[in-house]
A protein has these predicted regions:
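Protease-labile, long low-complexity intrinsically disordered regions enriched in Pro/Ser/Thr
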Residues: 1-163
């Protein structure tokens, strides 16, 4: 289950925008957006059976490599990194797992007309004071072709959270 706690522009039974080839989104009033934003809460249980344990100071370099493997272009990866890095780089370690099934099941996405390519990157992460051994996660991306929809986000799992 997902509850949207904040959206921009306002989410009224969905967003109605037209996507231009350059990525600009235009609503029915002619207002242009570079992206749509939503924040929410879910009771989804995130899977940390595979992932990475990264030193805080190595987080930017790790994310640059990981996000490229997951299919984000340079601009998208830059936006992702500048959003998350201030919360992560000072930690001794970050345990990171990119969620696929659990995220896409919790946060359904419907786009009309259907895109040729959908890239959804969702990072669950947790601060750690010590190195944590974790099976390495394989990172892959679909081939970008035609009309491509990109969504990225993440969540910090606080110590003591059961997710």
């Amino acid at each position: 289950m997902l509850f949207r706690s904040c959206t921009y522009p306002k989410y009224k039974n969905g967003w109605r925008v037209k996507a231009s080839p350059n990525g600009v989104l235009t609503d029915e009033n002619g207002t242009e957006y570079n992206y749509l934003y939503w924040e929410g809460e879910t009771n989804a249980r995130f899977d940390f059976s595979k992932g990475f344990c990264v030193k805080g100071g190595d987080t930017a370099a790790f994310l640059e490599t990981a996000l490229e493997k997951l299919g984000l272009n340079r601009r998208e990866a830059n936006e992702f990194i500048v959003f998350w890095l201030p919360l992560m780089e000072q930690n001794p370690y970050n345990v990171i797992s990119f969620q696929a099934d659990c995220y896409t099941q919790a946060a359904k996405l419907e786009v009309e007309p259907a895109p040729d390519t959908v890239i959804r990157v969702f990072m669950a992460w947790q601060k750690s004071d010590a190195f944590v051994g974790i099976a390495e996660q394989a990172l892959t991306a679909p081939e970008r072709r035609g009309f491509t929809v990109v969504e990225w986000g993440g969540t910090e799992i606080s110590t003591g959270d059961e997710n």
